[in-house]
Amino acid sequence: MTSTSSTGTRPLSAEHEELRRTVEAFARDEVAPVIGDYYEKGAFPYDIVAKMGRMGLFGLPFPEEYGGMGGDYFALCLALEELARADSSVAITLEAGVSLGAMPIFRFGSQKQREEWLPRLCSGEALGAFGLTEPGGGSDAGATRTTARLEDGQWVIDGTKSFITNSGTDITA
């Protein structure tokens, strides 16, 4: 039997199916049984995120030269689907860390920035964060008012964010 994605339209390669099964087992066996405890305590699941890093999930779509897995976004989507079956917030931690944190550095950062940040972001040692939503502007990127300026060698950020995905952890970069 050929395995297909959840849409049932694209046959999975052997590599994609292996990844899907691995993440499915991880989500079922290691995330689902304990995630409720984190919610009750109001705690961030550092051990789950560390394991996701060791599994290479944060590095799925990035080249090996930066500590990535050399995979593709389809692999990331498969991993996100399986994680979300167990807990959507764990899936969002991965999604935001990769797509909103590390990918802009990979696509638009300097070589120095890639070398400095991507190995830590791909390993899960550090998490990329993203802040868009502002009071009065919601999540409309065109309505943001926060600014950043370089002053005496330091960045000064002036503004307020309502939500910052992946913020408030000891590993947020």
Predicted segments, located by residue:
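A short core secondary-structure module
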Residues: 154, 158-173
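Short, solvent-exposed loop/turn elements at beta->coil junctions and helix N-caps
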Residues: 65, 133-137, 162-163
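A structural signal for short hydrophobic beta-strand segments in well-ordered beta-sheet cores
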Residues: 146-149
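A short, Trp-centered hydrophobic/proline-enriched beta-strand micro-motif
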Residues: 124-132
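Internal helix-loop-helix
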Residues: 54-125, 165-171
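Intrinsic disorder at enzyme termini
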Residues: 1-15
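A non-catalytic, amphipathic alpha-helix used as a structural packing/dimerization or gating element
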Residues: 15-29
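C-terminal helix-coil-helix/basic helical segment that borders enzyme active sites and/or dimer interfaces
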Residues: 32-43
